[in-house]
Amino acid sequence: MCRFIVILGLAAFLALMGGCGGHKPDAGVNVKGKLTKGGQPVTVPNMAARVGTVKVELYPIHTDPNDGRSSFGTLANEDGTFEIVGEGQGVKPGKYKLSVIADPGDGQDQLGGKYGEANSTLEFEISANNVGGTQNLGDIKLD
């Protein structure tokens, strides 16, 4: 009888767990681009050692707070290029603000906060036509 209860309990547990973990996020878009300032890649000292970083983030501009979109970020390479790969499947289509923070490793933004989340005027539409692929934002010129 005890063995039957243990087996029944284990079967119930496995049945409940069968519904967990199988959901994959909806497909999205990988987003890439290149940051330049004065015609040169946006860089900071010590980037090769990843002490200095140029952090790039996409923040959703919500028209519907329940649209399920969230922010995504990455670090730019020394040549100014970046690629944001969203939560396993890419960034969800919609309007986003692009934030750029150039930190040489001392916590100070060499861009003076001009392109931080609160101040950036860089806005992009991530197209539903690119779901499952990549959208290139091209050369993003910072002044």
Positions of the model-derived regions?
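Bacterial N-terminal signal peptides that target proteins for export
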Residues: M1-G9
